[in-house]
Amino acid sequence: MSDTEKPIKSEEPVDEGVDRVDEEENVEEPAEDVGEAAEEASEAPEEAPAEAATTTEAAPADDDEDDSDLSDLDEDEIKNAAIEDDDDDYNKLSAHRRKVQSSGKKTLKKRATKDSRAADDDEDEIDHSHIDLDPSMARRREIEARIDAAMKPASQRRKKLGEDDIEMMQDERISNLREKMRNAAIADAESNREGQPATHKLQLLPEVKDVLQKHHLADSILDNNLLEAVRIWLEPLPDASLPSYSIQEELFDALVRLPIKSIHLRESGLGKVVTFYRKSKQPQLRIKRIADKLVADWTRPIMGRSDNYREKVVSTRSFDPSTQEIALAVAAKRAQTLKDGTLAEKQAERRRRAHIPSAQPANYRVAPKSEIIPQNRGGSTNDMTFKRLKGKLGVTKTGKKKSGVSIEGRGLNG
């Protein structure tokens, strides 16, 4: 070794002795305070490397003495004591503890309902009206808000209409239509008096047709007395002319479909107008037939008659030859008067008798009474003819049997 290293060896033992004394004092302290010993043991490795760099090379022989001094300390006691202290400190903490409920039941978080979510969405919306914006920006936001509102699906909060609300809407619609029909009829009457064309009812006819064709509005039509407006439309105009044929056709077809009763006829006065169309010569033949059918249907329950044709009672009259003889005598007397009359009377009678024939609906109300008495004849001859015809039909159905030999040779022995 060199001379420079010798003084270093002579000086280091003094430091080792001091360090050894310090370590012995530190070893005796864990009995009093184990926590401080554990902290010093953890901090020792950080300070040791600087000292170890000088002591490990200079005094390798002193390691045995250090181990002998440290062997007096029980390492198990230090570990157990440190663990117990750590458990005590850990138990004092409250953050890691789980709260135990007194009821012992798990409480589930309720799901937010649609209404609550919608309310939260409404609250989250910010009102930007108080913010000062440029006119162009404000207009743009307003347009975007309108587009969003239009693109939104149908509101789920919309209240469903009940039956009462629907009936009220239907009654209101029928009442408004009745007033329109009445005003149109008054306007047409005034136009007719002034010599102008009456077109107000024709303009309103499509709307009236649309309402009268709906079956679910039948009760509302009858309850709100729409038949009164129908009567006003069917009445003749001030110049005694009937309304347009299209109006007559649509209204009479609607009257056939409606379940009209006597109370409705009494309130509206419709029966008088229909009877007028039935008896008048102005309406078309189809309208007269519909009017005749309506009168028959309306008077049947009043007269107590059934609508079943099997139960219908037809009035009959028997033929009396004496009345026929009287009618022939009256006709002969009239012919004699024509011969004895003047020329003017003869011409007048001829003009009245000769005319162009016109088709008229024949409505027979009295049926002739049958006086035929059925007679039972002997059935022997009828039975014989029936058997004879039956035998002939059987022969024609079976037909004649084919003759000759088949290809296979059948019928050779026959």
Curated annotation (Swiss-Prot):
Keywords: Nucleus, Transcription, Transcription regulation. This is Transcription factor IWS1. Belongs to the IWS1 family. InterPro entries: RNAPII_TF_IWS1, TFIIS/LEDGF_dom_sf, TFIIS_N. The gene is IWS1. One of its GO terms (cellular component) is nucleus. Residues 94-112 have a biased composition (Basic residues). PANTHER family: PROTEIN IWS1 HOMOLOG (PTHR46010:SF1).
